[in-house]
Amino acid sequence: MSTNLKVTLGVLAIALAVLAGVVLVNRGGDSTPAAVAEAVVRPDSHRLSTAVDSKTTVVEFLDFECESCLAAYPSVEKLRAEYGDRITYVVRYFPIASHPNSYNAAHAAEAAARQGKFEAMYKKLFDTATVWGHQQQSQAAVFEGYAQELGLDMTRFKADVASTQVADRVKADASDGEALGVQGTPTFFINGEKFAGRPDYAGLKAAVDASLNS
C-alpha cells in the first residue's frame, strides 16, 4: 500500500469517526422543545389553577421546608389571587436532602393529593412551616394531625405516605427538575423558560404580564 493511499485512508477514517461522534451526541439526550415542555409540566402535575386560554403557565419547583420558598409563598398567593384562571399555576416537588423533613412533607402533600386535598395541604404546610420546619426529629405525626384537620381518611393517608407509589411520584418531580437544571428552590418556569428574575411579587408579576401581553 502506497504512503499516499495510507494517508488518504487515515484521513477518511478520522472523518468517519468524527461524523459518528456527532450523530451519537445528537442522539444522546432528547432536548427538543417538546421534550423540555413535557419535563416542565407532566399530565399528573398538580395545578392550583388552570388558564382558560392556556396562554401562560407558571411552574414552581419547591421544597416545603425551604426558607426561600416560604419567603416567596405570600407573593405566590398574591399572584394567584390576582390572576386566577388567567394563568395556569403548577406546583412540583423538589425536596432538598439536607432538610430533615422535606421528603416527609412532600409525601404528606402527595398523599393528600390522592384524596383531592393537595392545595389544602400545600397551604397548611406553608402556613405552619415555622412550627415544623428544620426540626431534626420526624414531623410525621404533625403532618398526620394536619391530615385529620383536613378530614382525610387516615388509614388511606398513612398507607399512601408510606407507599412506594408516593415516593416514586415525588422522586419523578425531582428528577425532572434536575434534568431541567433546577439546583435550588424555589425555581420558577414561565411557559417553559426558567425565570431568572427575583422570585417576589413584582418580579413574577412582570414576567406574567409580559407573557399575557405577548
List PLM regions with ranges.
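Extracytoplasmic thiol/disulfide redox context detector
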Residues: 1-97, 171-174, 210-214
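Generic structural signal for secondary-structure transition and capping sites
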Residues: 29-30, 117, 130, 166
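Short clusters of hydrophobic/aromatic residues that line enzyme substrate/ligand-binding pockets
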Residues: 47-50, 132, 195
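Extracellular/periplasmic catalytic domains that process cell-envelope and extracellular macromolecules
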Residues: 51-52, 81-82, 115, 180-183
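Structural alpha/beta surface segment adjacent to cysteine/selenocysteine redox centers
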Residues: 59-148, 214
